[in-house]
Structure formats: C-alpha cells, structure tokens
Amino acid sequence: MAFGRRSEMADQWLFKSETYDNCNCAMNCGCQFNLPSTHGYCQSAFIGHLVEGHFNDTPLVGLNWAALYKWPGEIKDGNGKRQIVIDERADATQRSALETIVSGEACAPLSNFFSVFASTCSAFCETLFLPIDLEADLEGRTARVEIPGILKSKAGPKINEFNGEPFHIALARPSGSFEFTYAELGLGTTSVTGDMEMAFENSWAHFCVHHFNQDGLVRERSRLTAWLGA
C-alpha cells in the first residue's frame, strides 16, 4: 500500500506525540482565540516526540519530528511555506510514513492541523532527515530543542510579575479544534536557519499531546489535565 496518497483511506494509523510549539505571536495566539496574528504575519516551529504511533504495520514510537511554517500574512490568506524534519534514526519505511502523516496526506482533508496548514501553503521545502535533540516537560512548560544547523529553541513558563513564580495558564478546546483538546502555555525563543530562516523571542509557546488517526483528531482527555482530578 503506497504512502502519500490522500485517497487511500484504507491506511490505519495512529500519531500520538508530545509536542512543543513556538510561534511569533504574543501570549494570545490568534489561532487559538480566533483573532488576527500579533504582527500581521505568522511563523511557527512544531517539534514532537512519538509516545504512541504506527502507520499500518510500521511502528513509529520513539521517533522525533519537526514541522516549520512561515506565512507572509494571516494563515487563512495562504501563500505559506513549509519544511518537515524527520528523525534520522527512522528507517526508510518509517521516514515515508512520518512524512506522509506530517505532510497532511494521510487523513481526510482538513481533519487535523497538518492537513489544514498544508492547504494554506504554496511552497514546500525538501524534507530533511536529521538528529532532533528534544527535551520537553509538558506539565512543567519547559523545552529545549536543537536540530544541528537548522534550529535552536528553548521555552519556559511565563513568570508572574507580582511574585516571581511560574504563571500557570492552560487552554482547553472542548470542540472546534483540529490540533488539540488541551494545552499548557508558556513562552519560547526560537532561531531557524536555512530555507526557513526565522527568529522570535519570548513569544507564544504551547505544550500539548497531538493525538490523530486516519479520521482526524482523537478527542481523548489529555494526561496534562491530571491536576484537575477525576
């Protein structure tokens, strides 16, 4: 069964990733609050680690991935640019499977954020296969990422200016989201070189579980909500 064919809906797959995203917006990203972007244009870097996953019989657990995006204006206006980076540890079959999922070609159109974002892009850079060094604590709202020669990023919680303690803020999306149902929020700083050159500092960061399958977003209570109790 060939990868990369959106029409081949017989593929059965699961993508459950602990993901860190840093974009250039302030801490009220328009994507999540149905608002215009902070600066009138959008740039974003997603980096994740597969805690569960497969594409048909191909296992994906333990692999890392990244997706970099740039738009000259609002995302909805299109003309975006995308580059995918896949963990160099993946074998040929895993690389093909991950690229198919992250490109948005493995699901029903517009049923997850990979597909939605792909629909707004007109330029697609060559996929890279590189080491992705990712350390992320979703509950702690911290991350450190390095993709040699391409990306450096770090993130942490926003600090409460009144008492100097981490400011705990989170976002629930009970319906209407094509990306997550719950995310922890913080601030990140990212520098990207190469085809997707961009940089932003102390800007929106979110930490979430991306849980998708061939039908779209899987609506399951995230482990990040454990502090809410039963």
Model region roles, listed by residue range:
Residues 10-55:
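N-terminal ordered "arm"
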Residues 40-111:
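Aromatic- and glycine-enriched beta-alpha-beta binding-site module
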Residues 159-230:
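Extended, charged low-complexity segments
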Residues 1-8:
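Short, Lys/Arg-enriched N-terminal segments with co-localized hydrophobic residues
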